């Protein structure tokens, strides 16, 4: 039978069994290596209220904390919510992950720490 993907849609090479995780969207059990993972960094406070809170803050250089969440999606939810797209036969062979884009404030913080 023909094979659609070299890895069979998984990352479990010579492992036998991998524990399951729950999809954050539909709660379906998905093997951890097959689940599509997305790491999300968000401000706890919404963008409209950031300025009000920083003005009301007693501390001048107080940085608002962020929410860090690792989301696990099953394949169908990841396609439906446009986290991933189905690709043509030629582009399916490209195994390098796409270029990651980071929030602008995160890049500024990393540059400040290096200096």
UniProtKB/Swiss-Prot annotation:
GO biological process, one term: cytoplasmic translation
Domain of life of the organism encoding this protein: Eukaryota
Main location: cytoplasm
One function term, GO molecular function aspect: structural constituent of ribosome
Entry-linked PROSITE patterns: RIBOSOMAL_S26E
Matches recorded under InterPro entries: Ribosomal_eS26, Ribosomal_eS26_CS, Ribosomal_eS26_sf
Entry keywords, A to Z: Cytoplasm, Endoplasmic reticulum, Ribonucleoprotein, Ribosomal protein
Pfam families tied to this protein: Ribosomal_S26e (PF01283)
Segments of this protein annotated with the region Disordered: 86-115
Compartment list: Cytoplasm, Cytosol; Cytoplasm; Rough endoplasmic reticulum
Similarity field: Belongs to the eukaryotic ribosomal protein eS26 family.
Quaternary state and interactors: Component of the 40S small ribosomal subunit.
Protein name as catalogued: Small ribosomal subunit protein eS26
Species of the source: Anopheles gambiae (African malaria mosquito)
């Amino acid at each position: 039978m023909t094979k659609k993907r070299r890895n069979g849609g998984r990352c479990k090479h010579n492992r036998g069994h991998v524990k399951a995780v729950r999809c954050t969207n539909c709660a379906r059990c998905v093997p951890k290596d097959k689940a599509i993972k997305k790491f999300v960094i968000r401000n706890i406070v919404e963008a409209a209220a950031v300025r009000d809170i920083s003005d009301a803050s007693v501390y001048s250089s107080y940085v608002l904390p962020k929410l860090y969440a690792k989301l696990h999606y099953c394949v169908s939810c990841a396609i439906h919510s446009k986290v991933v797209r189905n690709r043509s036969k030629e582009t399916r062979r490209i195994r390098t992950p796409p270029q990651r884009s980071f929030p602008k404030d995160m890049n500024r913080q990393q540059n400040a720490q290096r200096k």
